[in-house]
A protein has these predicted regions:
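Short, amphipathic alpha-helical "lid/cap" segments that border enzyme active or binding sites
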Residues: 28-35, 39, 313, 317, ...
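Cys/His-rich Zn2+-binding cysteine-cluster or related metal-binding knuckle/ribbon modules and their
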Residues: 196-198, 223-234
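Ferredoxin-type iron-sulfur electron-transfer modules and their immediate structural context
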Residues: 1-12, 17-214, 218-221, 244-276, ...
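Glycine/threonine-rich phosphate-binding loop and adjacent beta-strand/alpha-helix elements that clamp
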Residues: 2-13, 535-554
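Amphipathic alpha-helical
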Residues: 209-227, 337-340, 347
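A general boundary/transition motif marking the beginning of the first structured unit of a protein
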Residues: 93-97, 304, 557
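Catalytic alpha/large subunits of respiratory electron-transfer oxidoreductases
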Residues: 158, 164-165, 170, 228-536, ...
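N-terminal leader/propeptide and maturation segments of large enzyme subunits in energy/redox metabolism
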Residues: 120-142, 555-583
């Protein structure tokens, strides 16, 4: 019964064949048991029953749980399902239950307190208790009951599930730097929390979520602003983050087309391992905010009003036909596919792609545009790192991990932050730094001035070759440079920018911007929705030449609408208007 093995050769059987006439549900259940046993037999050669997963519960029955545990929640009575009148039900075959209205259904769903532990499928404690056949009845005794901390907008702390392993404490102190967690109290009352039991919001917490990743149980979990976690199955996909130039590999979890969680893959970790910054782990939630641009907006008397995609297409067709000059601008925040789409439009009017001069830097000509498979291997080739100015959180963590191997870290003009406590040396002037041929110089192009960057390049060139690592806050900086946009801009009658408000848009007769978010003060006449890195299948080049991919886990159709618009404007060929063309 526990394996469906018949004892005859390698034959497993269930359902009606084994039971006789029975229900389909029983047959399906037998099939699942047999499938699990067959898989184990093929893997190990043993025929054994599946272990019953260990489940930790507050009590054996609901009646044993004290109502005081839920005193912090407002008690809302359950709504009764509207039903067909009895007299009518007797003489008809209509559905008796009429169903809730949308408002009532949403209200009823909000009554749910919790859906159990959100890491029950990955919890190490549960796994070990299952493997060793732990019986919780043998470990009776007193229990600590701690209130669950919901004060942080993105991190939930449930001390009741903590096993005091100290992983979060060490990671926060030794890898990330803030050291905001620690053991408080002693003995049985010991608790892992910030000093004096305060909220994480009252500490120097970076909100990077690294403590969540290293927690082996459910004591630390993510919290989403617009979606309630639940234990239902999720669609998993791997892609790269698109919020800066580091290009971290991320794992997205989706339910019904809605992103519910962004984390790192346990099975296929990228160069960033389990490391993500605040933006990478939680920043995606901004794409579900109220200021997200989802429909075209036309400015009328200084106020933006919603219009349809067709109306927006007709408006662009009318305005561009009235102008004598056109300009199409790209930005390093968009994918290569989006740049190529706009290039088709520029080609239509025999003009070249343009870009705001603010995206240009003196070092652009020195940056390699060649794709790299393992770009951050460069960190392994040096023994000392000189960091000028502030860096992206993940890149700083990668450098810290190298430092823990015995390498030297020197900071120059780094703003006050927890990362500073790891520095072996700290300087205010780059010329004071003592270096060797094994020194790598690192800076973020967006976080220091052009003058400071120039001084660093001159200083580094005196010490050796290929010893500079340039990072940016741009999603697709090398890809942007590879398109060779024109930075010498003049006033045009019609201007359109993708991922940026067009340069000198106020002086144009008509201006359009394809953007991700609304802005009531946008200096353009028409706003068109743009897909985020989670809403299209695309490609980009990260700062060091890594080819990054987007997989559209949100199942968005914004890029489809844009390609339809470009096709109707005769900017692209019919073949180009099909998604497979770009895959």
């Amino acid at each position: 019964e526990s394996t469906m093995f018949t004892g005859l050769g390698n034959v497993f059987a269930g359902g009606d064949f084994r039971r006789g006439a029975a229900t389909a549900i029983e047959a399906i259940a037998d099939g699942r048991i047999a499938a699990t046993a067959i898989d184990r037999f093929l893997e190990t050669g043993e025929i054994a029953a599946e272990l019953i997963p260990f489940d930790s519960k507050k009590a054996n029955t609901v009646k044993e749980i004290s109502p005081e545990e839920y005193s912090i929640y407002e008690k809302i009575e359950r709504r009764e399902m509207p039903e067909l009148p009895v007299e009518e039900a007797k003489i008809s075959f209509k559905e008796v239950e009429l169903g809730f209205s949308e408002t009532d259904a949403v209200s009823e769903a909000k009554r749910c307190l919790e859906c159990g532990c959100f890491v029950n499928e990955t919890c190490f404690l549960r796994k070990y208790c299952t493997d060793y056949l732990v019986n919780p009845a043998q470990f009776l005794g007193d229990k600590n009951k701690h209130p669950i901390d919901y004060t942080h907008p993105f991190i939930v702390r449930d001390a009741n599930k903590c096993i005091y392993c100290g992983r979060c404490i060490r990671t926060c102190a030794e890898i990330q730097g803030p050291a905001v967690l620690g053991y408080i109290y002693r003995g049985f009352a010991t608790l892992v929390a910030p000093e004096f039991g305060d909220s994480l919001t009252k500490t120097s917490c970076l909100s990077c979520g690294k403590c969540i990743d290293v927690c082996p149980v459910g004591a630390l979990t993510e919290r989403t602003v617009h979606y309630k976690f639940n234990p239902h199955l999720k669609d998993i996909s791997l892609q790269n983050c698109g919020l800066c130039g580091v290009g971290c590999l991320i794992q997205t979890e989706t339910q019904a087309g809605t992103i519910t969680r962004v984390t790192t893959s346990q099975k296929e970790p990228g160069f960033n391992g389990k490391n993500l910054c605040f933006k990478g782990r939680f920043g995606w939630q901004s794409f579900y905010d109220k200021d997200r641009l989802t429909v075209p907006l036309k400015k009328e008397k200084g106020i933006f009003k919603e219009i349809s995609w067709q109306e927006a297409t007709d408006l662009i067709a009318e305005k561009i036909s009235l102008g004598n000059s056109q300009r199409f601008e790209i930005s390093p925040y968009i994918s290569l596919e989006e740049m190529l789409l706009l290039k088709r439009a520029a080609d239509k009017y025999t003009t070249v792609l343009s870009a705001n001069p603010a995206f240009s830097a003196f070092s652009d000509s020195c940056i390699s545009l060649r794709p790299q498979k393992e770009p951050y291997r460069i960190l392994d080739n040096f023994q000392e790192y000189v960091v000028y100015g502030e860096l992206n959180q993940v890149l700083a963590t990668l450098i810290r991990l190298q430092q823990r191997k015995g390498k030297k870290l020197t900071l120059v003009n780094y703003p006050e932050s927890p990362f500073c406590r790891f520095a072996d040396a700290n300087y205010a002037n780059i010329k004071e730094v003592q270096t060797t041929e094994k020194t790598l110089f690192i800076y973020n192009q967006n976080r220091i001035s052009e003058q400071e960057a120039y001084e660093l390049w001159c200083f580094a060139s005196e010490k050796g070759k290929d010893n500079l690592l340039v990072s940016t806050d741009y999603h697709n900086h090398p890809g942007f440079l590879a398109m060779q946009p024109n930075f010498s801009l003049t006033v045009s009658d019609f201007v359109l920018g993708w991922g940026v408000y067009p340069f000198l848009s106020a002086e144009a007769k008509f201006s359009v911007a394809i953007m991700t978010f609304k802005d009531e003060k946008a200096p353009v006449d028409l706003l068109i929705p743009a897909p985020s890195y989670l809403e299209m299948e695309g490609t980009a080049l990260s700062d060091l030449g890594q080819v990054t991919k987007s997989a559209n886990p949100a199942k968005s159709i914004i890029i489809n609408e844009l390609m339809r618009m470009f096709y109707c404007l005769k900017w692209i060929h019919p073949n180009s208007a099909e998604i497979p063309f770009w895959n």
